[in-house]
Design a protein with these regions (language model features):
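Short, glycine-biased loop/turn motifs at secondary-structure junctions and
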Residues: 1-184, 188, 193, 197, ...
Length: 237
């Protein structure tokens, strides 16, 4: 699978449509697509709707059927791994609405699409991203040996995959259980969320922020995640 199926034209058209949505304030969190006088949707919803517009296949983009398998459809149509389609969504929902320089979240779909080079093989972007995030989490975990051991175990699996080795489903499942448990015990809430998300690459897991300070820390962590992902995407040729 090659990004944009090797087509610079597809990338250009997608960026144009995403920017139309952004300038119309149509990129919002919490929904894949809704219509209340004007269509609005999240990063993934915006991207899929943009591709529908490009293909001339709008149809009914706000019903439940349209949202089914939306990450898989984005993966196939953009030529990117499914993990990255899900990660684009996760980061978008976690980013702050705005920052000192203006809006943050609404720019994310454009930044994500722009960072991807047509024809690039993005297979190893997710494992490399996960390793970066998890290594930060080791620092956050401090003296919590249970967390450090669990996180290092997941790092080892991802590094084996990056090196071309095979990681079995049983190994992923075991790592998921231990890392999720360790994440609950981690002292830093943002690290706990990041560790759980990376360890659960093949399962659903989310950690709730306990208070406003926790939520702010998580927003900061998601901003760092966004920067890491964009860097890895740009490096992939």
């Amino acid at each position: 699978m090659l990004a944009y199926h090797g087509s610079q034209s597809l990338k250009n058209k997608l960026l144009t449509q995403i920017e139309i949505h952004r300038k119309a304030d149509a990129i919002v969190a919490g929904t894949y697509g809704k219509l209340n006088g004007q269509w609005k949707g999240c990063a993934v919803g915006c991207s899929v709707r943009s591709l529908d517009i490009i293909d001339g296949k709008l149809g009914d983009c706000i019903n439940n059927a349209w949202a089914e398998n939306i990450h898989q459809r984005l993966s196939e149509r953009m030529g990117i791994p499914l993990e990255l389609a899900r990660l684009e969504d996760t980061i978008f929902e976690g980013l702050p609405e705005s920052g000192p320089k203006g809006k943050v979240r609404a720019h994310w779909p454009t930044q994500f699409a722009y960072a991807i080079n047509p024809g690039a093989d993005l297979t190893l972007v997710w494992p490399k991203f996960a390793v970066r995030m998890l290594k930060r989490c080791v620092g956050y975990a401090g003296s919590n040996e249970r967390s450090v051991t669990a996180i290092n175990g997941v790092i080892a699996l991802f590094e084996r995959r990056i090196a071309g080795g095979v990681v079995t489903l049983a190994e992923w499942q075991t790592a998921r259980v231990y890392a999720a448990a360790a994440a609950h015990a981690a002292a830093h809430a943002a690290a706990a969320h990041a560790a759980a998300h990376a360890a659960a690459a093949y399962a659903a897991y989310a950690a709730d922020a306990a208070d406003a300070a926790d939520a702010a820390a998580r927003k900061h962590e998601f901003a760092r995640m966004a920067d890491d992902l964009l860097e890895l995407l740009r490096e992939s040729k």
